[in-house]
UniProtKB/Swiss-Prot annotation:
CDD domains from the UniProt entry: Fumarase_classII (cd01362)
A GO term, aspect molecular function: fumarate hydratase activity
SUPFAM superfamilies, per database record: L-aspartase-like
Protein keywords: Acetylation, Chromosome, Cytoplasm, DNA damage, DNA repair, Lyase, Mitochondrion, Nucleus, Phosphoprotein, Transit peptide, Tricarboxylic acid cycle
Phenotype upon loss of function: Embryonic lethality. Conditional deletion in the kidney leads to the development of renal cysts, reminiscent of hereditary leiomyomatosis and renal cell cancer (HLRCC) phenotype in human. Renal cysts are caused by accumulation of fumarate that promotes the formation of non-enzymatic post-translational modification cysteine S-succination (S-(2-succinyl)cysteine) on proteins, such as Keap1.
Assembly information from the UniProt record: Homotetramer. Interacts with H2AZ1.
Similarity comment text for this entry: Belongs to the class-II fumarase/aspartase family. Fumarase subfamily.
Misc. comment: There are 2 substrate-binding sites: the catalytic A site, and the non-catalytic B site that may play a role in the transfer of substrate or product between the active site and the solvent. Alternatively, the B site may bind allosteric effectors.
Pathway: Carbohydrate metabolism; tricarboxylic acid cycle; (S)-malate from fumarate: step 1/1
Protein name: Fumarate hydratase, mitochondrial
GO biological process: arginine metabolic process; DNA damage response; DNA repair; fumarate metabolic process; homeostasis of number of cells within a tissue; malate metabolic process; positive regulation of cold-induced thermogenesis; positive regulation of double-strand break repair via nonhomologous end joining
Source organism, top-level taxon: Eukaryota
Species annotation: Mus musculus
UniProt GO cellular component terms: chromosome; cytosol; mitochondrion; nucleus
Amino acid sequence: MYRALRLLARSRRLLRVPSAGAAVSGEATTLPRCAPNVARMASQNSFRVEFDTFGELKVPTDKYYGAQTVRSTMNFKIGGATERMPIPVIQAFGILKRAAAEVNQEYGLDPKIASAIMKAADEVAEGKLNDHFPLVVWQTGSGTQTNMNVNEVISNRAIEMLGGELGSKKPVHPNDHVNKSQSSNDTFPTAMHIAAAVEVHKVLLPGLQKLHDALSAKSKEFAQVIKIGRTHTQDAVPLTLGQEFSGYVQQVQYAMVRIKAAMPRIYELAAGGTAVGTGLNTRIGFAEKVAAKVAALTGLPFVTAPNKFEALAAHDALVELSGAMNTAACSLMKIANDIRFLGSGPRSGLGELILPENEPGSSIMPGKVNPTQCEAMTMVAAQVMGNHVAVTVGGSNGHFELNVFKPMMIKNVLHSARLLGDASVSFTDNCVVGIQANTERINKLMNESLMLVTALNPHIGYDKAAKIAKTAHKNGSTLKETAIELGYLTAEQFDEWVKPKDMLGPK
């Protein structure tokens, strides 16, 4: 993949989530209102003093964020470190802020300032500054605090690069320069789409493709294994184990098709819409140029959204993508359940599949082994279904010119993409590739099945065939014995007409 995608993948592997206490280095304290021209560095307790429009706040000297970030940590103490804004969103912001700085330089932003912003934004995109983003998802529904967290971090890092004083907002101002031609209302949805697209391409689709390929290989491996089918969990007519697995292959294939079909709307970026979609305080061409820069940085086909009012006020694209993932979760739930039920036993279940044994299954029953990968996959599927409910509620609550469920929506979309991608890889590596067919058990169950009688329908009719099946079941006899005893056909006729290998498709 392209440069930014490689950097994002590398940064995720190196990600360290600090404790909630380390994030803000203690309780922030509100000081008397004033707006100094430069920040006053506090000599005690390793704080510096910064200000926002509400007044002064103490900021840890070892952090690049500023007053608005500190104020958010004071106002939204919800959930702790585990509820932080997803790092993919922060890294997407880094990509966006770099692209905006490039375009703003074309429109007259001081090249020295633009260059420093771009370098700092690159560090954000690469995950080098993850420790400086302490805010939780549960904040303003527009994501304004996170946008300002990004602006402050990039501003202070750029100031440091230029030899200035942290918190001074000189020579790089978080609003006037880093956020130039932007609003939280268009930057956050842009970052949402960038993050979602990257996660889909880096994690979700590769995971599903791996699972698809493994299931396809098993379908071919089991092509000659004839088994009894089941409908309503009851015996049905035969099919091959390969045919059964081919259904799973198609489900995963369609899952990828649906996800890819949702991506063109994800590639549309809100950047340039600013506050309500009109593009106030931007230059003509800014939106198109930013989208092109983001596309170049990520290697993904991003374009400017054709209607910025829709891009800010509604997030139907994310609901659509979440819906595709929800459908994938339904498919994976069915596949995992089928495989674990077919592997149930080892002596008292169906036992048609032999599943890999990966770890002890019980703290009290010696020798017990469980279908743990199937269980993990079904739990992931359930979580994704729940995530989609939240995304659906969020998407339906765009009021007037702005949807204010943005952070919650992207948190759940990214969570679903990551879980499905990772679970698909785990399920493939630790279960699917090691599945074996228990042909002895499969043959035994098939030969005992009463539904082989269906092959007699064209020869003796439905009613007589049903009589054979019911009588055989009642008496505990075989179909062949019962058919002969009832006088409906000879042994030779039964052997000629009831052949499982001839019951696998149309004639």
